[in-house]
From Swiss-Prot:
One of its GO terms (biological process) is DNA replication, synthesis of primer. It comes from the Archaea. The keyword Ribonucleoprotein does not apply. Keywords: DNA replication, DNA-directed RNA polymerase, Magnesium, Metal-binding, Nucleotidyltransferase, Primosome, Transcription, Transferase. RNA polymerase that catalyzes the synthesis of short RNA molecules used as primers for DNA polymerase during DNA replication. Residues 167-253 form the Toprim domain. It comes from Natronomonas pharaonis (strain ATCC 35678 / DSM 2160 / CIP 103997 / JCM 8858 / NBRC 14720 / NCIMB 2260 / Gabara) (Halobacterium pharaonis). This is DNA primase DnaG.
Amino acid sequence: MQDTAKYLVHADITADGVVERSDVVGAVFGQTEGLLGDELDLRELQDASKVGRIDVEIDSENGQSFGRITIATSLDRVETAILGGALETIDRVGPCRSAIEVRKIEDVRSAKRREVVERAKSLLDGAFDESMRSSRDLVEEVRESVRVEDITDYEGLPAGPAVADSDAIVVVEGRADVLTLLQYGIKNAVAVEGTNVPEAVASLTETRTVTAFLDNDRGGELIRKELGQVGDIDYVATPPDGKCVEDLARHEVMSALREKVPYGRFKQAASDDADPEAAEQRTGEAAGATAADSEPAATDGIGGVTTDAEGKPVSSPESPAESPAADETAAVSAGTTPADAEEAAVDGATKTSTAGEEPNTPDDELTATSEAAEPGSAETKGESTAAEAPESSADGPAAAGASTDEQPKTLRGHVSDVIEAETGTFRLLDAEFAPLAAGDAGDVFEAVADAETVPAAVVVDGEASQRLLDIAAQRGIDHVVAASTGEFVKRPTSVRVRTATQLLNPEKA
């Protein structure tokens, strides 16, 4: 009956005396018999399984009894309510007066519905965690599988598929960083996986253009410092503050790589941040040098030649504001062509950039020496100073005869000695175009790679190959002059490459 019951009738009973359970059951059947007719008689309803067992719980205390009566029924709501009203007509249980009050009629189906709701909640919370997945999860899983398939190993380290063949690589911290870059189409990344830089990565950086793309935390700083000691870093890229490389969006990755800076400049900026007093001192020294150079000198009025306090001719430095038109005018007045004046300015230039500066230095930023700026100064006074010797040796026959054993002091002079003379050799020159090393043209690559002092220029009586240009760019060389040039797959922007013809005879080039 409990399985088919629709309603439960809950009633409270009190009696003025001590009664037993059997007394209560007998009173229920006896006092309701014939009260509601045959169709609603309790015995008939029990026989028809429309009313279940009558449950009675009774207790006695201080000469009184009290308890609860529960009757299960499958009748409809109206008949159940009539049955509840009939129970309240019972006024005696055994020899004692009593009172019965129906407390509530419970809908069993409602109780079952509550159980169903509670169970459904628990199932919804736990049963679907593993089986139900959103479309975003599915897309991410497929994308991750593709990225994992693309990642390869380089000497046991996570790397993109293009690391082995690419002439430029991106060094990152871990496997997750490589996966992030792969997702955005960057396939030449290799991970060091820890603060101890592997020898494979250190060796790889010596022959490739290297960009260190590491986090801005302590670990990234240590890796960058060690990589700069055991390997060769060309550029440094950093993620936005507070973010790791593996968490960057596509536009953040591309922006960081576009805004990479040369390693030397990055180190200088880092040292300035660590020691602001030294940076301020360097700034003051530079300002003082500029002020000293800008002091006006006296003019003797003869041919516009500038003289110092002792009356000796001095050449004024070229003004930064001079335009190409002014250069051409000066060249014509000195009896030379504009092209010759431009080449003389390049030959007498002083190397101002270091290995850590921005490689894309325009040619017009090379500052010509005072001798190239005023070739007629010595002729006007009839005397020549030691500082004017480089230009005089290239253009003045008298100066050339004075010391035939001296090395040329200009790039043109070295090109004439090495390439025009068809010596089959090379020369490495410093910033003042003084020779650092020389040898057979076939050994120029090894000489550049092993040079203790980084040369400013290379003059070789042979072909300027892609291999030579790559090592020149890595070492920070500004000029390469060769007898001929080969086919270049990638021409470095930091190295100015010319043939001897282009330098000595630009009108024939």
